[in-house]
């Protein structure tokens, strides 16, 4: 019996090698593996036959021969398995290959909203003039929105028909949705006593109004410059430089009209004649009122300053010829595709 086992092993090895080489798929190879190395396979049967050998030395030697056979078959199967897997991957890649000569489908890319574009551009222009961008809260107390800005309690702007008041008070203070970004200049002057103070603040503001030229929420950018000997001439120069740069017209016609704002004295409204159109108001400005300086603890006899407030929507409507303010917030993709900008234009 032992001699028969030894004589069968080379024949079995040749047969196993042939079947492994001829396996055309991983499924076929698995059948070969089970027939030789499985629990009911030929090699397992050989190991079981060792139990019938009494001589320990003979059993050991024959077991070593069978073990060599098992390891060789296992190595051949592993090698063949890797070969078949590589072949499957190559075949899959070949069948799934992309024809690079086919025309590509156009990729849809989102666009920058005109308001985002204008805010970015305005900030950049003022940054080149030395203004630092700052932020402030949308929900404010009455002091920062009205009282500190020299707006008396009987002023029409403080009535509920014009201003959104919140029901809950904070620290016993009546809260509002800010009606202008001027509240940011108050907060800046309260905490900053090093001069010069030169800031711009862009953000959302809220007023109870809705028509073709007004929305309950819109955007402003506030500017403030405080130092010794600041004068109206510097204000006019700053506004002129900004508007000329923004509209890309060094010869832009600009005029200042006397006006009134509680927080500036003197005050002015600025009009432009853009693309040979009639005069159009674009912003309000003026010299910071002495009472405003008193309310934030700045010596108005030593320091002076100017401030201005610009409607972002108004600038965008003029520059890009948008007729209805409400269209900024309609969320129409067709409108944004027409008036929007490529992301690379946002700086």
From Swiss-Prot:
Protein location: Cytoplasm
Main localization of the protein described in the UniProt heading: cytoplasm
Its EC number(s): 6.1.1.20
Co-factor requirement: Mg(2+)
SUPFAM superfamilies: Class II aaRS and biotin synthetases, tRNA-binding arm
Cofactor annotation comment: Binds 2 magnesium ions per tetramer.
Ligase is among the record's keywords: yes
Residues that hold Mg(2+) according to the record: 265
Enzymatic reactions: tRNA(Phe) + L-phenylalanine + ATP = L-phenylalanyl-tRNA(Phe) + AMP + diphosphate + H(+)
HAMAP family: Phe_tRNA_synth_alpha1
Similarity annotation: Belongs to the class-II aminoacyl-tRNA synthetase family. Phe-tRNA synthetase alpha subunit type 1 subfamily.
Name listed for the protein in its UniProt record: Phenylalanine--tRNA ligase alpha subunit
